[in-house]
Amino acid sequence: MPKAKGKTRRQKFGYNVNRKRLNRNARRKAAPRIECSHIRHAWDHTKSVRQNLAEMGLAMDPNKAVPLRKKKVKAMEVDTEERPRDLVRKPYVVNDLEAEASLPEKKGNTLSRDLIDYVRYMVENHGEDYKAMARDEKNYYQDTPKQIRNKINVYKRFYPTEWQAFIDSLQSKKMEVD
């Protein structure tokens, strides 16, 4: 197939263009990804941020949502008519957010599998003898007896039920051997 007629020029690099500003402006103009899934699914891209949040029953500006009372000016009963509230068209968003906020928070901090195995090995082989644990060949990081004791205490604090089950299993093993 023949080529389309016309001038074909190679692309020239625009030296006078500020790439940093160009990228910054492109990032600023690009719509951000909304992290909250409830808000993201109810979002209407044809409307402004203020309109979207008003439809969901959320406030864009917290200062305007809950205005502070003026101390000096006392309004008369005639002036204190209820302001017409914006119509909340998507109340399920607020309900979902409230339900999610009422859930208990997950424990984010856990111990590494290596540390758990290390503590279990040391207690299984040496019991409460921290000096023997410090001399053990599996003590790769050359922890002192106090450091080992602290690691064991951390394990006890993080996993109390597992620790109790582990100690019970050790005692049952000792009884079988005796």
Curated annotation (Swiss-Prot):
Compartment list: Nucleus, Nucleolus
Cross-link type Glycyl lysine isopeptide (Lys-Gly) (interchain with G-Cter in SUMO2), residue numbers: K74
GO cellular component, one term: nucleoplasm
Keyword DNA-binding applies: no
Alphabetical list of InterPro entries matching this protein: Ribosome_biogenesis_Nop16
Keywords: Acetylation, Isopeptide bond, Nucleus, Phosphoprotein, Ubl conjugation
N6-acetyllysine found at: K90
Region of interest (Disordered), residue spans: 1-30
Modified residues (Phosphothreonine): T8, T144
Keyword field contains Hydrolase: no
Entry similarity comment: Belongs to the NOP16 family.
Name of the molecule in the record: Nucleolar protein 16
Source organism per UniProt: Mus musculus (Mouse)
